[in-house]
């Protein structure tokens, strides 16, 4: 239920160039845009650097305090934030290997694999980083007409 509510508001919060996990957006557009930028810079002999970032173990590495601060920054209400906090407080897990379960251990970061809420929480956290990149005047994009391609997600 919470995932469905979050899914509905994401298109209003997440920048249009973030195509993953946002309804009515297609990640193929981002791939096409990357090729278009590369072709443009090659044809105009424009020097530049294209950086591709792949978050290693992305869902496992998201710090909860950062996630909660992102929810606050995007003006989610206290009730919604408290629901999310409830999902990520005092979580324990174990590892099953060859049918044998390990002792339980406390989790301290990450969003749950397979949980429908997880991709939405993750892209909210990534959007916060993306906003910082877009607003940083020292990070330049490639100017194509009146548009600057600075960040493609």
Predicted regions and their residues:
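Nucleotidyl polymerases of mobile genetic elements and RNA viruses
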Residues: 1-153
């Amino acid at each position: 239920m919470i995932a469905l509510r979050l899914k509905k508001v994401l298109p209003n919060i997440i920048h249009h160039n973030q195509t993953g996990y946002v309804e009515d957006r297609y990640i193929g557009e981002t791939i096409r845009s990357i090729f278009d930028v590369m072709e443009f810079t090659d044809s105009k002999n424009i020097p530049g650097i294209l950086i591709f970032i792949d978050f290693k173990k992305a869902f496992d590495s998201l710090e909860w305090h950062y996630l909660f601060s992102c929810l606050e920054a995007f003006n989610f209400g206290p009730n919604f934030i408290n629901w999310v906090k409830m999902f990520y407080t005092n979580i324990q897990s174990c590892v099953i290997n060859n049918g044998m379960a390990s002792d339980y251990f406390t989790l301290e970061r990450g969003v749950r694999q397979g949980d429908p809420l997880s991709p939405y929480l993750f892209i909210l956290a990534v959007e916060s980083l993306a906003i910082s990149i877009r607003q940083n005047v020292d990070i330049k994009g490639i100017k194509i007409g009146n548009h600057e391609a600075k960040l493609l997600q």
